[in-house]
Swiss-Prot record:
One of its GO terms (cellular component) is NuA4 histone acetyltransferase complex. It is found in: Nucleus. GO terms for biological process: chromatin organization; regulation of DNA-templated transcription. Keywords: Chromatin regulator, Nucleus, Transcription, Transcription regulation. InterPro entries: MRG, MRG_C_sf, MRG_dom. Residues 178-189, 229-243 have a biased composition (Polar residues). Probable non-catalytic component of the MSL histone acetyltransferase complex, a multiprotein complex that mediates the majority of histone H4 acetylation at 'Lys-16' (H4K16ac), an epigenetic mark that prevents chromatin compaction. Residues 135-210, 225-247 are annotated as: Disordered. It holds the Pfam family MRG. It comes from the Eukaryota. Residues 142-156 have a biased composition (Low complexity). This is MSL complex subunit 3B.
């Protein structure tokens, strides 16, 4: 099959983030502290919830006849691809699988290779299930929505560099081709113009995992979208509490859909097994996930999609990168980068990674 050209626009704020990421890793020899405070599974799950609630409010604000058009002769509302929650879920699951497979191949700089080998070793990170389960149970008593609307405080975005390095705008001018160069990466180069490829390809595995790390503060912004009919200061979306006014004005079916998606998980609670090392999406965060979007056009160009399906997929990717851009300060704190000497990985003193 002939490879086709696929275009995926990256917002300017994320292009600058890619340049900064390259600068921190290759010029200042810093590494992203692992496991990330907000890992990729958490980001993807947060996006699905954000997507579902945004779509619900958008549909509720439009006149009924605009979103209840019958599909063909069936009495089923037509849902555009960009509003389809099931497609959104499939998209994030595809991102998870693709990230886990491609990270060691094309998403790491050479300086990060040693860190990757250590963090994916089975004895470096140990999953602690019991304490996390107890914590989650106590949180569930508050209802899923309260956990999302009142998350724990994310990493500080105010930490400043203590070195005398040039300011960000200057280094961005010095490295204007960061995004473009990532798209044409070649193996084992040590500068900002390339991402490395490993010499061997690991067997693809459909890893499944979960975590109890906190979500960023993005859901605090959703409180502003509570319908005017609501008089509750602490929204609760669980069906068990009858008479909750949070989604007064919504159809009962839509309220149930939102309740369902707020409790939705990307992967089962019992994965990965405790005797296996966690997959990359369990450990890495937004910094490395963003690099995947530089590579996606090339990856998609080699896959067999119909034009209709590809168009729908690209629309969902576009919405997702806009989401990353909107909550850029939450997902990309400067404090995520630390000196290599501060990154301690010891098989004698393994670090704990929470599991649900």
């Amino acid at each position: 099959m002939e490879e086709r050209t696929v275009t995926l626009e990256i917002p300017e704020v994320l292009k600058r983030q890619l340049e900064d990421d390259c600068y921190y890793i290759n010029r200042r020899k810093r590494l992203v502290q692992l496991p990330c405070h907000t890992n990729i599974i958490t980001i993807l799950e947060s996006y699905v919830k954000h997507f579902a609630i945004s779509a619900a409010f958008s549909a509720n604000e439009r006149p009924r006849h605009h979103h209840a058009m019958p599909h063909a002769s069936m009495n089923v509302p037509y849902i555009p691809a960009e509003k389809n929650i099931d497609l959104c879920k499939e998209m994030v699951d595809g991102l998870r699988i693709t990230f886990d497979y491609t990270l060691p191949l094309v998403l790491l700089y050479p300086y990060e290779q040693a860190q990757y080998k250590k963090v994916t070793a089975s004895k470096v990170f140990l999953a602690i299930k019991e304490s996390a389960t107890n914590t989650n149970r106590s949180q569930e008593k508050l209802s899923p929505s309260l956990r999302l609307l009142n998350p724990s405080r994310p990493q500080s975005t105010e930490s400043q560099s203590t070195s005398g390095e040039p300011a960000t705008p200057k280094r961005r001018k010095a490295e204007p081709q960061a995004v473009q160069s990532l798209r044409r990466s070649s193996p084992h180069t040590a500068n900002c113009d390339r991402l490395s490829k490993s010499s061997t390809s690991p067997q693809p595995k459909r890893w499944q995992q979960d975590m109890s790390t906190s979500v960023p503060k993005l859901f605090l912004h959703l409180e502003k979208k509570t319908p005017v009919h609501s008089r509750s200061s602490s929204p609760t979306l669980t069906p068990s509490q009858e008479g909750s006014p949070v989604f007064a004005g919504f159809e009962g079916r839509r309220t149930n859909e939102i309740n369902e998606v707020l409790s939705w998980k990307l992967v089962p609670d019992n994965y990965p097994p405790g005797d296996q090392p966690p997959p990359p999406s369990y450990i890495y965060g937004a910094q490395h996930l963003l690099r995947l979007f530089v590579k996606l056009p090339e990856i998609l160009g080699k896959m067999s999609f119909t034009e209709k399906n590809l168009k729908a997929l690209l629309k969902h990717f576009d919405l997702f990168v806009r989401f990353l851009a909107e909550y850029h300060d939450d997902f990309f704190p400067e404090s995520a980068y630390v000196a290599a000497s501060e990154v301690h990985y010891s098989t004698r003193n393994p670090q704990a990674v929470n599991k649900c």
